[in-house]
Structures are given as C-alpha cells and as structure tokens.
From Swiss-Prot:
This is RecBCD enzyme subunit RecD. Heterotrimer of RecB, RecC and RecD. All subunits contribute to DNA-binding. Keywords: ATP-binding, DNA damage, DNA repair, DNA-binding, Exonuclease, Helicase, Hydrolase, Isomerase, Nuclease, Nucleotide-binding. It catalyses: Couples ATP hydrolysis with the unwinding of duplex DNA at the replication fork by translocating in the 5'-3' direction. This creates two antiparallel DNA single strands (ssDNA). The leading ssDNA polymer is the template for DNA polymerase III holoenzyme which synthesizes a continuous strand; ATP + H2O = ADP + phosphate + H(+). Belongs to the RecD family. GO terms for biological process: double-strand break repair via homologous recombination. A helicase/nuclease that prepares dsDNA breaks (DSB) for recombinational DNA repair. Binds to DSBs and unwinds DNA via a highly rapid and processive ATP-dependent bidirectional helicase activity. Unwinds dsDNA until it encounters a Chi (crossover hotspot instigator) sequence from the 3' direction. Cuts ssDNA a few nucleotides 3' to the Chi site. The properties and activities of the enzyme are changed at Chi. The Chi-altered holoenzyme produces a long 3'-ssDNA overhang and facilitates RecA-binding to the ssDNA for homologous DNA recombination and repair. GO terms for cellular component: exodeoxyribonuclease V complex. Transmembrane segments: none annotated. Gene3D superfamilies: P-loop containing nucleotide triphosphate hydrolases, RecBCD complex, subunit RecD, N-terminal domain. In the RecBCD complex, RecB has a slow 3'-5' helicase, an exonuclease activity and loads RecA onto ssDNA, RecD has a fast 5'-3' helicase activity, while RecC stimulates the ATPase and processivity of the RecB helicase and contributes to recognition of the Chi site. It holds the Pfam family RecD_N.
Length: 640
C-alpha cells in the first residue's frame, strides 16, 4: 500500500504529511499479526484521514461515495488505475466492513470517550482522535453551560426596563437586535449571526451596556477576533457604536469607560505558542474574564475553538458573532455553521415567553427545538444595503442559490454592478491588469505629486488630515480580490503583473518587484507583537525605507513577513469592506469555487462591485456550496 501512496505523493495528490502519517502507522504495525489486507486498510485510512482533514473536513463519512472516489481519483482519468490497485490491496473489502475489520487495531478506537488511539470511529465516520476530542469538548461545554445556568439573576421586569432604554425606537415588526440582546442576557453562551450590515457589533455594544448596568459596571470584558485586521475592524465598530449611543442615549461617563474599546487577536488572548500546541491559558490556567466577545467566528477553525472553550472559566459569558453564509475557516471545521444550523428551528415555549415579557415581541415557540436554539439569534435587516441596492439584492440572490437571476441584476444596476466576461485566460489577465492600472492611477498620482513637491507624508493637507492618510484612503477605496493563490489569475501572478504594468505606465519605479519601492502596498502575513503589526494589516510604502499603516510609520527593516497587496485573496478580505470591490474568478472550474466564496467577495463591496468571470463559472460557483464533513452537528443533535 505504501508504494501506491508514494506514487500519489510524487504526483502531488497526497502531501508529505499524508504520506508520512500513513508510513508511521505502517511502521508501528509491521511486527503485528494483522492480516495483510487489514494492514493495508489501516495504512490507507491513515493517509485518507490526513488528506481529508487538510481539505477542511474534521471527519470522513465511510460511505459508497468515499469508497469509489478515494483521494479524488475517480475524477482523474490518468490516475484511476491507482484506485483499482488500492482496492486490490485491501482485498476488495467493502466500505461497510472497514470499521469492523479494524476492530481491536492499535491505531483505531471505536470508543473514543474511554480509549485513546491516533484515529477514531464514531457515527460511521473516521476521525483523527484529536479532532473528535475537540468536537466533544465543544459540545460538552455547551451542554454543561445550558444545564448549569437555568435561573436568571434579574427579573424579567428589570431586563425589560434596560432593553427599553437602549432600544427606544418602537417597531411593529420584530426588532431582532433587541431579541438578540435579550437572548444573550439570559444565556451565558450565545451566538448572534447575520449578514454584512445587519448590526452585529451595534447589537453587542448595546448588550455590553445593558450587562454593565445590570452588574454595576463590575464586569471584566474582552473583545477578540481571529486576525489583527478583524480585531481592528471590531475596535472601530465598537467605538462608532459607543459614540452614537453616548450622544443619543446619555450614556454615563463611568458606563462608557466600562466598555472595552480595544480588541486583540485570539492567538494573543490565549497566549498561543507559535512552535507547539501549547497555550498559556487553558483549563489549568483559565482566563480571568466575566464576558468574552468573539467576532468573525466563521473564520475560527475547530482546534482554535476548542482551545478557546478550554480556557474559559465555567462562569464566563461567551458571545460569538459571525456570518455563517461567509467562507468557513481556512483550516479544518465549520464551527459557526454547525452551531448556527439550528437557527431555523423555533424557540422553546419557555424562551418565547421570556422574549415576550422582556422585548414585547411574540415569537414562535415549540416543544421540539434543540436546547441550543435558545442561545441563537439571527439578524436579518441589513443597514449597509438599502432595499434598492444592487449589491444587497445580488448578495441575497447568491445566498439563495439563484445563479441565473443573479447575472440579470448586473444589467438592472449598471451604475453599481459591472460584469466583465472572461474566456481565454491570457486575455483575462490583461483585462484585470488594465483595470488595476486605471483604478490605482489616482493614488499613485497623489503620491507622485507628494514626491515632486518634497512634502512630508505626515504633513497635514487642506482638509486637516495627513497626506499619508489621504493617500491610503484613496488606495483603500478600491480592492482587487481573486479566488486563487497559484494560477495565472491567482494572487501571486496578478500582483507581479500589476506591478510591472504600473511601472510600464511610469506610475511606479523599481528594478525588481520584490524590492521596496515608493507606492508598494503590502499585507502582513504573520503577527508581530513587537511592532504591533498583525496578519491582514495593509500598509503603503510612501517614502524610502518607510511603510505607513494609517498614521503610523514603520521602518521597512522591521516589517514582519508580508506580500504585495495590489491583489489579495477573497479569503484574506474577510472582515473588511471597500467602497469599490473588484472580484476575479478563474476561467476554469476549480475546487475552491463555492457560493460562500462568491458571497464573501461580493459583500466586501459597499458602493460598487466589478466582477471578472466566465458566466458559466459564475453560475457553477453559486450552485456549489461548501459541504465540510463534521460530527459536531450530530453531537449537538443529542443535546435533547
């Protein structure tokens, strides 16, 4: 079996990690008396478990589809002979017998609660043991939290009064922001979901104000997000919401100061060690917090969510914010999607009665809902896009899978939506590069004028802001996004081609695109606490040897790992928004294409969206949803 897997590694179907994990299992079992087909099956499943995990699946359902398409070989006509060879080496054992065949094998456990092994079987699926353990820990946390806190510390009337203060607007239709705050007051674990502009951070700001009032401003609260960029956006949103409420609702000085206005990354909060799996804060040394707010939860993978849960005291109130319609985490798992799937169920009768008493809104109640439903609230009304917004309608059509209708919208909203059809890949690169040159011309002209007039970037212009800030605002008004990293239409090639085209137009001057040059935009790709730069931060080189991040300048020799940012991936854009977004899709079908990817790219745009894509590829992507295999939903179903 190893010889076949080695060939698949040479063909780059399997990674080095996939192959060497399988080899480890082979070495461990070499002196055992397992039958040869069983040994081969164990080696196969080790490679398969690793391969599936790196694709984002926390487990692999042992079904006929998996059996007939091992490692995706069924769709590779030149490599399909390897599939036949694999089945021969496991003695043509059918998939429904795989688990029984490995009963008692040293590398597998059928009872992961009581027995540890590298891999585990559960619910007819194959797991890495650590992935099963992470899912189990999350569900146990939710189960214990729901059971432990069934009594409210405050009366319905007290909660009602606070909600009326912070939601003075009278609405006939249900104000889901108000419902979300009431839900999170009652439950020490809550999830607030919603699309872009639905007011998740505004809602959580009101929630924190209510909680601090109820607890006499004594709560220790922290704000976190998965990336530095997302943390900055959370800070900005909280500050804006607080400023508005202080002005409109007479928030006291002490209450205002009781709400944190600084956010950190999850890695920073937990003290994650970059070289191993250890975190400073864990079950033995929990975070000393009363309330933790986590934004952009869709970006959090399974292992990180398990680490977070593990570091909380039982009495800490956890509030998760996110949009399950966006892309799931880069690494394995789709935690928010699994947790939020129960939002379509009605609330329990008990929760419905509580919401009626505290918010005045009547919601549907049921005896059959999953207990986690009472912890969830989904916000539906977008404040970013009005009812006549083309971007708003397009995002709605994409979310509903209306591929054909979505294309028609580009004709109905020509001022807001632009679709450029792509066919030939070479021509597509030229089209995208030409568009980038035109869109970046303005900020580079501003920078050139600054250079010619020998003006310090930190000097103030006529509007009272620094020239550095004005140039960055112009640069950030448009953002080019692409679906891929390695491809002619991928981020690496397009960044290079755009830089060369700008030099050809005499808008940039450099010898090598890898050099530091004035006008070069960069994106930080790893956190560096010493210089306070974080993954996702965007900077501009505005003077020799200096890069500006907002009003802060950093010497180029202190910049951590980074990459050019004329173009960035849609994945990296999560948590950001731009006045004009330009999105590029590949000209051929690619596994990365999905409805979630397109939705994420489209909803980065605030005022204008330009798309470069083949019409068939656009439709295919919208019809393709991400289906990551996980056992979290199955474990949650058993909460009843």
């Amino acid at each position: 079996m190893l010889s076949v897997l080695h060939k698949l590694k040479e063909l780059r179907i399997l990674s080095q990690g996939d192959y060497y994990f399988a080899k480890l299992i082979a070495d461990k079992q070499c002196h055992t008396d397992y039958a040869e087909p069983v040994k081969n099956l164990a080696i196969l499943l080790a490679a398969l478990c690793s391969w599936r995990y790196t694709q984002g699946n926390t487990c692999s359902q042992l079904d006929r589809y998996l059996e007939h398409n091992l490692f995706g070989l069924a769709y590779r006509t030149t490599e399909e002979d390897y599939l036949a060879e694999i089945h021969e080496k496991i003695g043509y054992l059918p998939v429904e017998d795989w688990q029984n065949a490995l009963c008692g094998h040293m590398a597998f456990t059928q009872d992961p609660v009581n027995q540890i092994a590298p891999m585990a079987f559960q619910f007819g699926a194959l797991y890495f043991y650590r992935a099963w353990q992470d899912e189990y820990r999350i569900v146990q946390y939710i189960k214990n939290t729901l059971k432990k806190y069934r009594t409210l510390a405050f009366s319905y009337d007290e909660i009602h009064q606070k909600l009326e203060k912070y939601f003075p607007e009278k609405q006939e239709k249900t104000d889901w922001q108000k419902v979300a705050v009431a839900t999170a007051i009652k439950s020490p674990f809550s999830i607030i979901t919603g699309g872009p502009g639905t007011g998740k951070t505004t809602t959580v700001t009101r929630l924190l104000l209510v909680l601090q009032e109820l607890f006499d401003c004594k709560l220790h609260i922290k704000l976190v997000a998965p990336t530095g960029k997302a943390a900055s956006r959370l800070e900005e949103s909280i500050k804006n919401a607080l400023g508005f409420m202080q002005e409109k609702m007479n928030v006291s000085h002490s209450l205002f100061n009781a709400i944190p206005q600084k956010a950190s990354t999850l890695h920073s909060l937990l003290g994650v060690n970059a070289f191993n799996d250890y975190t400073r804060y864990n079950s033995h040394n929990p975070l000393q917090l009363d309330v933790l707010v986590v934004d952009e939860t869709s970006m959090i993978d399974l292992p990180m969510m398990a680490k977070l849960i593990n570091a909380l005291k039982p009495e800490t109130r956890l509030i998760l914010l996110g949009d399950q319609a966006q892309l799931a985490s880069v690494e394995a798992g789709a935690v928010l999607g699994e947790l939020a799937q129960f939002v379509t169920q009605p609330y329990s009768h008990e929760q419905a009665a509580y919401l009626l008493a505290t918010t005045g809104y009547k919601v549907e109640g049921s005896d059959c809902s999953n207990p986690i439903r009472d912890c969830l609230c989904h916000l539906t009304e977008s404040r970013r896009f009005d009812k006549d917004s083309g971007i708003g309608k397009l995002s709605e059509f994409i979310q509903k899978g209306k591929a054909d209708d979505s294309l028609e919208l580009f004709d109905h909203y020509p001022q807001e939506l632009h679709f450029n059809s792509l066919n030939d890949e070479g021509d597509a690169v030229n089209q995208v590069v030409k568009s980038a040159v035109e869109n970046y011309r303005t900020f580079l002209k501003m920078l050139d004028d600054l250079r010619k007039q020998k003006i310090d970037p930190n000097a103030k212009n006529e509007q009272g802001i620094s020239y550095a800030e004005a140039i960055q605002v112009q640069f950030n008004s448009v953002r080019f996004l692409t679906a891929l990293r390695n491809n002619n239409l991928g981020v690496e090639n397009l960044n290079k081609e755009i830089a060369l085209a700008l030099r050809e137009q005499k808008l940039l001057w450099f010898r090598n695109e890898q050099d530091w040059y004035i006008g070069k935009p960069i994106m930080i790709t790893e956190n560096d606490h010493n210089v306070r730069l974080y993954n996702g931060d965007i900077g501009l080189c505005l003077a020799n040897g200096k890069v500006w991040f907002g009003n802060r300048e950093v010497l180029t020799n202190r910049i951590p790992a980074h990459e050019p940012a004329f173009m960035m991936t849609i994945h990296k854009s999560q948590g950001s928004e731009f006045k004009h977004t330009v999105m590029v899709l590949p000209t051929e079908v690619n596994p990365v294409l999905s409805r979630e990817l397109v939705f994420t790219g489209v909803t980065r745009a605030k005022k204008e969206l330009t798309v470069f894509a083949d019409e068939k590829i656009w439709k295919t992507a919208i019809r393709q949803t991400v289906k990551r295999q996980s056992g979290l939903g199955k474990l949650l179903e058993d909460l009843n």
